[in-house]
């Protein structure tokens, strides 16, 4: 039997298998008249995928679901398929980029797009985090593509098919030219791929989104219509106030943003903005004025101090790349600027360079929304400062001051988040 793909004709996850089939010379038939919400709810479909998601591929040996698994199956249907590379390391790199495409590109495009389409709840802070994470991912992809035409090797592989299909949704639905122009190598790569004959057979002519979709507002529920009653003559009563019926504008007004949990903490004697002003305005006698002022202000009940150490210092072999890495981290921390102060040090005169930091956060722990939204956090070891330990307290002071040498080594760079 031929391979049969169950999905809508415009489904970008189905495109992966269809493009792989074009390159591989494998026949895959797309079912006709597939209707999302109907076709995928039938008993026959649910036998193939019990949770009703698409796409699903029918094969002689049984069904396969999950789009990357389907694309792999189609690719492996042809022996020695060049879409899987020519060596073990190329195969590993193809799978590496497939994972990156799913978790770093597709996921973040979805987190930005779906709430705007009304498919998921819209939360402004979450959108900002999704855009920041997507920019980080596209930045990494852009760097790789600066010196590579394809993701792996010197011809199209399955990695390019999966990446292009995931980028397709972003370019077509939400990533405008003003957004993608920051990543010129990604742009060049995407337009090169979608204009390859085997891609174009499936995708057709691709046009870039001209604007970001507006946030979809939920339509107010239809008002109940009461059955008409025969008119009765009755003495006129004084007009009653209308019951709880808001004017149109009020119904459509956006709901107030939910408060950040940190705003609900008990008041602290430490006013973070006052400390930031003191830090910025102290030009001389820094230890006597700013450092002393910090410890006078510090409230261990309302704030916590944390050391961070980069886990992969062996990778820090190029000075400007290391400094850019730290700068990118600080940009992504922007969502907590109201609640944090930080110092990041790049240490050493020769590579590999060490990256260490000190952070002051509102509350007794690192805020959960920071851990959830700033992906760099997991690249560091975090240790809570014990201010009863004089050595740790002095280390805090030295890091705030940019004291050099620091722990016996020179400072290549020091950055402040305030």
UniProtKB/Swiss-Prot annotation:
EF-1 is composed of four subunits: alpha, beta, delta, and gamma. Residues 1-82 form the GST N-terminal domain. Residues 210-265 are annotated as: Disordered. GO terms for molecular function: glutathione transferase activity; translation elongation factor activity. Residues 87-215 form the GST C-terminal domain. Residues 258-418 form the EF-1-gamma C-terminal domain. Keywords: Elongation factor, Protein biosynthesis. The keyword Protein biosynthesis applies. InterPro entries: EF-1-gamma_plant, EF1B_G_C, EF1B_G_C_sf, Glutathione-S-Trfase_C-like, Glutathione-S-Trfase_C_sf, Glutathione_S-Trfase, Glutathione_S-Trfase_N, GST_C. SUPFAM superfamilies: eEF1-gamma domain, GST C-terminal domain-like, Thioredoxin-like. This is Elongation factor 1-gamma 2. Probably plays a role in anchoring the complex to other cellular components. Residues 221-246 have a biased composition (Basic and acidic residues). The keyword Protein biosynthesis applies. Gene3D superfamilies: 1.20.1050.10, Glutaredoxin (3.40.30.10), Translation elongation factor EF1B, gamma chain, conserved domain (3.30.70.1010). Pfam families: EF1G, GST_C, GST_N.
């Amino acid at each position: 039997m031929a391979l049969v793909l169950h999905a809508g004709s415009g489904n970008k996850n189905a495109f992966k298998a269809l493009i792989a089939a074009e390159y591989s010379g494998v026949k895959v038939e797309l079912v006709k008249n597939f209707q999302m919400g109907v076709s995928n709810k039938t008993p026959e479909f649910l036998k193939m995928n019990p949770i009703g998601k698409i796409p699903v591929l029918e094969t002689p040996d049984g069904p396969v679901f999950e789009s990357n698994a389907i694309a792999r199956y189609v690719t492996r249907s042809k022996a020695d398929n060049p879409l899987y590379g020519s060596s073990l390391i190329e195969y590993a790199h193809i799978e590496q980029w497939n994972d990156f495409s799913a978790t770093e590109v597709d996921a973040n495009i979805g987190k930005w797009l779906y709430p705007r389409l009304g498919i998921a709840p819209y939360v402004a802070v979450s959108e900002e985090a999704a855009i920041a994470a997507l920019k980080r991912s596209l930045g990494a992809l852009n760097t790789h593509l600066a010196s590579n035409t394809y993701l792996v090797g010197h011809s199209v592989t399955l990695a390019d098919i999966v990446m292009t299909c995931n980028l397709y949704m972003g370019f077509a639905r939400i990533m405008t030219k003003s957004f993608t122009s920051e990543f010129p190598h990604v742009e060049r790569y995407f337009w090169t791929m979608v204009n390859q004959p085997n891609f174009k057979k499936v995708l057709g002519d691709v046009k870039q989104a001209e604007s970001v979709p507006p946030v979809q507002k939920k339509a107010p529920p239809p008002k109940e219509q009461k059955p008409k009653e025969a008119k009765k003559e009755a003495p006129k009563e004084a007009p009653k106030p209308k019951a709880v019926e808001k004017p149109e504008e009020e119904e459509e007004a956006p709901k107030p943003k939910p408060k950040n949990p940190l705003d609900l903490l008990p008041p602290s004697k430490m006013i973070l903005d006052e400390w930031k002003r003191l830090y910025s305005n102290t030009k001389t006698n820094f230890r006597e004025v700013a450092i002393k002022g910090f410890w006078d202000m510090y409230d261990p009940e309302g704030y916590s101090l944390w050391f961070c150490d980069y886990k992969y210092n062996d990778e820090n072999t190029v000075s400007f790349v290391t400094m850019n890495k730290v700068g990118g981290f600080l940009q992504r921390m922007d969502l907590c600027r109201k609640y944090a102060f930080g110092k990041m040090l790049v240490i050493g005169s020769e590579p590999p360079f060490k990256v260490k930091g000190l952070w002051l956060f509102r509350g007794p722990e690192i805020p959960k929304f920071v851990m959830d939204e700033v992906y760099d956090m997991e690249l560091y070891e975090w240790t809570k400062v014990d201010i009863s330990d004089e050595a740790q307290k002095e280390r805090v002071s030295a890091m705030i001051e940019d004291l050099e040498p620091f722990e016996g080594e020179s400072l290549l760079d020091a950055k402040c988040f305030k």
